[in-house]
Amino acid sequence: MVALHESLSLISMDPLAFLTDQFNSAKCAIFCGAGISYNSGVPLMPDIKKKVLSGLPMNLKDTDELLNCKMPFELFMECLVENTANTSIMDLFALGKPNNNHTWIAELAKKGLLRIVITTNFDELIETALNTAGVRYQLIYRENEFDSVDWESSGLKVVKIHGSIHDRLNIAVTIKKVSGRELVH
């Protein structure tokens, strides 16, 4: 009953105090997506769709339909990868420099307050910020790497669940698998 009581008191705690307590326990993970890199110049999905579609020979009606459809990002990217030899769209994920979000993650990691960073981002801005801060980390982004990770070991792990711009072929495979799951569900 004491454990339950302690848990309930943490829930009623001031949110900032709660987060501070959790970070100080060094048991924290951060999960982040596309928005974290937006201020670094990496475009969000709607902007990517507009850029891609503006470069294709399509009529306005078809372009509008594709812009307004609820197609998952992964499926859109899979269609793009499979139907065009132009891979320059992937260069969009190589834009920018780390912003305050990436620097904050690196500072938390440098202080030993993080165990894992999980991201859906293809860009390498988190890694760049960690390198700049002198933080050692294990990068995990290929499917075959997940089975060999010692999740209990110390040290920061950066998990890129959609792959990395560093390995464009792996991104295509990941996108295909995720978009396939989206269609099945």
Question: Residues of each region from the PLM?
Answer:
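Conserved catalytic-core helix/loop/strand module for nucleotide-ribose chemistry
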Residues: V2-H185
